[in-house]
Design a protein with these regions (language model features):
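Bacterial N-terminal signal peptides
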Residues: 11-21
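Acidic/histidine-rich, surface-exposed loop or edge segments in extracytoplasmic proteins
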Residues: 33-54, 368-392
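Short, solvent-exposed recognition patches
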Residues: 50-365, 375-376
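Surface-exposed amphipathic alpha-helical segments
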Residues: 381-417
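Bacterial N-terminal signal peptides that target proteins for export
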Residues: 1-12
Length: 417
């Protein structure tokens, strides 16, 4: 040990002694893949979810109690799954949550808060068992990081099991998205995108977006771009008027003269000349920006042409073409190539949530659909670079797969209304 390290070590020992503490003796953790685990008690919904989602969904205390009762029923079903009923190498924690709800700005017909079933979720976590030495004692724990398995309840919106966004819609706040495509089955459950769906009719969860609806969103997105450039042009035009105003110019030069005098510059005319040059440069820059062949002026002209492109196209379409289901080809090089009503390779149907799927006659607390998310992370074992899926640990993904593969699907279907 060199002198510097020796001094650092001695200093640390002295500091601990002064503080009256002791130096804990730690050891590396040891994984215990054969140790028996346990199912820990359910975490109450009140401790795992905030009030935001409850308020947004206009849920009463009675509704929340009933919804938690449904989640507890699901917990009981999953707890009986042979693959995880008697945990070995991991312990299980389960809890629920209530999702938020908001009406999108561009979502005609989306129900108001309180008109849909309570949306939330159920989380299954298989945490590894390990131990370590501390101060001469063996400490065993079953916590830490793990791959969680989520079950979404009564949630059918975009972005849950697929990114689903449409670049041509920009940042518009809409409930429309690209439909998650079917990808076969896992453990007897249909896979759509990155999720497994348990429902009366998985394909009925979403309703087609008409071509008119898809193109209207393009119009709105491009109108926003035009508006932004128009606002920039207005600001730059106003600034150019100020720069060219003789009174403003005289004021700036007078202020320059006063500053030069206050600083006792040896040659104030040089400084004043610099200010005049700066004014000229600012004017030239603004003129360039406002030119329709360059800068903001050109960007505005381009944005207006792009807006006309879609509005002109809409005007050319027949009522039947506007009503046809829209399809989005992400790699299309033109607007018309991207938005088509003809299903083809690389083209995904555009959809919205089918709010009519939910039976309004049932209590709002009733579960009507479950989507198991994050399937790629834990089930894509063919990808050798997927470390989570191929982990040798009995916790995390291995336990998640055992749960999904051995859980009683018929009991879950019976649990759904």
């Amino acid at each position: 040990m060199n002198l510097t390290l020796s001094r650092l070590w001695l200093g640390a020992v002295v500091l601990i002694a002064v503080l009256g503490g002791s130096m804990p003796a730690w050891s590396q953790t040891r994984s215990l893949p054969d140790a028996p685990g346990t199912w820990k008690p359910w975490k109450p919904l009140s401790s795992t979810t905030g009030s935001g989602g409850v308020k947004e969904q206009a849920a009463t205390s009675a509704l929340m109690k009933a919804f938690e009762g449904e989640l507890l029923a699901l917990n009981a079903i999953l707890r009986r799954a042979p693959g995880v009923a008697s945990p070995v190498g991991f312990s299980v924690e389960t809890w629920g949550h209530v999702a938020g709800y908001r009406v999108s700005e561009h979502a005609p017909g989306q129900p108001a808060a309180g008109k849909l079933p309570i949306a939330g979720g159920f989380t299954f976590g298989a945490f590894p068992i390990f131990e370590y030495e501390r101060n001469g004692k063996t400490i065993r724990e079953d916590t830490g990081e793990t791959a969680l398995q989520q079950f979404l309840v009564n949630q059918i919106g975009g972005g849950l099991i697929d990114r689903g966004g449409v670049a041509d819609w920009g940042p518009l706040d809409t409930d429309a998205f690209q439909k998650p495509m079917p990808q076969g089955e896992i453990a007897g459950l249909p896979r759509y995108g990155d999720g497994l769906i348990i429902a009366r009719d998985p394909a009925a969860l979403w309703t087609p977006l008409p071509q008119r609806g898809a193109l209207d969103l393009v119009v709105k997105a491009r109108q926003l771009v035009v508006q932004e450039f128009e606002e920039s042009m207005a600001a730059q035009t106003a600034q150019l008027a100020i720069v060219r105003d003789p009174a403003n110019r005289a004021k700036r030069l007078k202020e320059a003269q006063e500053a030069a005098a206050l600083a006792k510059m040896p040659d104030p005319q040089v400084f004043i000349k610099q200010i005049e040059q700066a004014i000229a440069i600012e004017e030239a820059s603004l003129v360039k920006e406002l030119d329709p062949t360059m800068g903001t002026g050109k960007s505005l002209a381009d944005a207006k042409r792009a807006l006309s492109e879609v509005t002109d196209w809409i005007a050319q379409l027949s009522p039947a073409e506007l009503a046809a289901p829209s399809c989005y080809a992400e790699k299309g090089t033109t607007l018309r190539a991207r938005f088509t009503t003809v299903a083809a390779a690389g083209c995904r149907p555009l959809v919205r949530p089918n709010y009519g799927y939910f039976n309004a006659a049932l209590p709002r607390s009733a579960p009507q659909v479950v989507i198991i998310t994050g399937i790629k992370r834990c089930f894509d074992t063919a990808d050798k670079y997927n470390l989570d899926a191929n982990s040798p640990s009995p916790s995390g993904c291995r336990a998640n797969r055992a749960l999904v593969e051995t859980m009683d699907k018929e009991a879950i279907r019976a649990w759904l209304r």
